[in-house]
Amino acid sequence: MTQRTITLIAGPTVSGKSALALQMAQKKNALIINTDSMQVYDVLNILTARPTEADTAIVPHYLYGYVSPALHYSVGQWLCDVRKLLTTFTSKSLIFVGGTGLYFRALLEGLSEIPHISDAVRQKWRLRLDKEGAENLYRQLLRIDAVFAEKISSQDGQRIIRALEVYDVTGKKLSWWQKKKTPPLISPNCSEKILLIPPRQWLYERIHKRLDNMIERGALEEVFAMKKLMLSPFLPAMKAIGMPEFTAYFDGYKSFEDALEMAKTQTRRYAKRQMTWFRNQFDEEWTLISSCEEV
């Protein structure tokens, strides 16, 4: 009987990690599990570069495109869904692939059991961030939870308001909650870990080509479909690649050319942040490669 293997493949957007996962899954007779926070959402098939029907016909893919964009899907919910898959497929080899570093970390290290934060509280703090700015809220966070505040940048608005909303709801510091973790679903020693980071210029050229291709394939129709849902701009799905820029185009605030160029710029910046995070957070147990050919 072939021994079950678990493989983790992380990398920035457009790096080729999905193609690598497909290639390895065929060799290992494995299932592919989404480890990307945007690819869980329905509607956003093209904008989030979900696997094609041809890909899913070759290898079974799980946790893709099954969550309503109207929901605020969390890493905790993703872990619950992964746990169900691990229970269902007890002997099947698995490949986790994606670009969301926090998902990989939660998978290998466990997750703090922070109570649910309501959409109303989330929206309250996002409005305050827009009105007061990250610096002002960071000073408030320093008074409440200096331990966590000193770990992050004073410009990191999302993590600042995350800590503030947790304190708002629970009355306890985020640094306190982070000490209370669930056991990891996968032992770090029982998996093959691959970090795919291609040369930056190659990656940027791929980003430009992919966005042009997304437009040709109907990305604007997806944006329009999302607009018709009249969702809160604070929902994660509304921040998918191209959504803010092309929404501004439909609303008459940008020309199509400016929206496309801004989408390319923001995607390059996102890829750069991903690469920085992976390099800083992942240890030497991850095998660093620059192309699929190295596997």
Curated annotation (Swiss-Prot):
It catalyses: adenosine(37) in tRNA + dimethylallyl diphosphate = N(6)-dimethylallyladenosine(37) in tRNA + diphosphate. One of its GO terms (molecular function) is ATP binding. Keywords: ATP-binding, Magnesium, Nucleotide-binding, Transferase, tRNA processing. One of its GO terms (biological process) is tRNA modification. Its cofactor is Mg(2+). The record marks T100, R122 as: Interaction with substrate tRNA. Substrate binds at T13, V14, S15, G16, K17, S18. It comes from the Bacteria. The keyword tRNA processing applies. ATP binds at G11, P12, T13, V14, S15, G16, K17, S18. Its EC number is 2.5.1.75. Residues 36-39, 158-162 are annotated as: Interaction with substrate tRNA. Belongs to the IPP transferase family. NCBIfam families: miaA. Catalyzes the transfer of a dimethylallyl group onto the adenine at position 37 in tRNAs that read codons beginning with uridine, leading to the formation of N6-(dimethylallyl)adenosine (i(6)A). Monomer. PANTHER family: TRNA DIMETHYLALLYLTRANSFERASE. This is tRNA dimethylallyltransferase. The gene is miaA.
